Amino acid sequence: MTPPDKLHLIERAAERLIRDGAVPAGLGAGAQPGTDLAPPPAAALPPPLPPPLPSAPDPAASAPAVAPRRMIDLALMVAGGLADGDGRSRIAEEFRLVQHQILRSAFGADSAGDHANLVMVTSSRPNEGKTFTALNLAASIARRGDHRVLLVDADAKHGSLSDLLGLNDQPGLLEIAADPALDLGVCLIGTPFATLSVLPVGRQRGHRGDLFASNSMLRLVQALGDRYTDRLVVLDVAPCLSTSDPAALAAAVGQVLFVVEAEKTQRDEVEAALDLIQTCPTITLLLNKVKMSTSHSFGAYSYAYSS
């Protein structure tokens, strides 16, 4: 935990929110049925990311410059939680605000540095809306059209993005991490958006979940960022207090988008989760499922972040 004389990440974010006079944005997530909250992992920080091994092959190097072979149907994406991004709807405008902050940190003057194009989306516990957020952030940027996006399912739990999009029988992230010689291009799935591709979690998640904390997975994630420097790589990762995966992957990414469910997630849960991922240089907090009255206008919405 942080020393008494040093404000916690969430306290710094709250101070910024109050100072700016803003109200956190409310994104209406389609929550999945509840699951039990697993006990928090040990409070110890994950070890520093080891340097890449010179002899290890680049697991993303074999990806061909061709379009993905399979396409996800738009209706299936909508059923999986894709919101209407057209027009001036509140949710579309809110995701445009979120994407502006993420893209500025990734490619703009406020770049977060190395691997800033790698964005991990997570939360404290299940059903706070992280998968909804990851899917709609990726789609919002793809609709904009000036940046390519790779949406990666890095959650080995059942009910993940791959399940929602009908990709649970497809090879993906886990297979590539286990076998760097596997062609990444074979695993990429196309979408109705020309600039958006999806990498499923893979078929081995039932018995290869340990790969998320392995050096091969960390090398793979960073290789994706190094190879696709012109695109944003959005990783939908399991909740911090359900598994140690986010703590391990936080050292490999340049940004974390941390989803907090309004009026439900406890402060101590948020603090415990943030302590586990503070190895990432830039952490953005997004308050989700806020109940707004009809008198609120779009201009009152914002979100807090800490870095």
What kind of feature is each model-predicted range?
Residues 1-95, 211, 268-307:
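C-terminal lobe/tail of nucleotide-utilizing enzymes
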Residues 6, 87-94, 98, 130-133, ...:
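Helical mechanochemical/support elements of P-loop NTPase systems and associated helical scaffolds
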Residues 16, 20, 101-105, 109, ...:
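Conserved, well-folded catalytic cores of nucleic-acid-processing
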Residues 75-114, 170, 174-176, 181-186, ...:
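Extended, non-globular alpha-helical segments
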Residues 92-156, 163:
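Walker A/P-loop phosphate-binding motif and the immediately C-terminal alpha-helix
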Residues 126, 158, 203-206:
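A short, flexible beta-alpha/helix-coil linker loop
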Residues 140-201:
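Phosphate-binding loop that captures ATP/GTP phosphates
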Residues 163, 171, 194-195, 209-307:
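Conserved catalytic-core segment of NTP-binding enzymes
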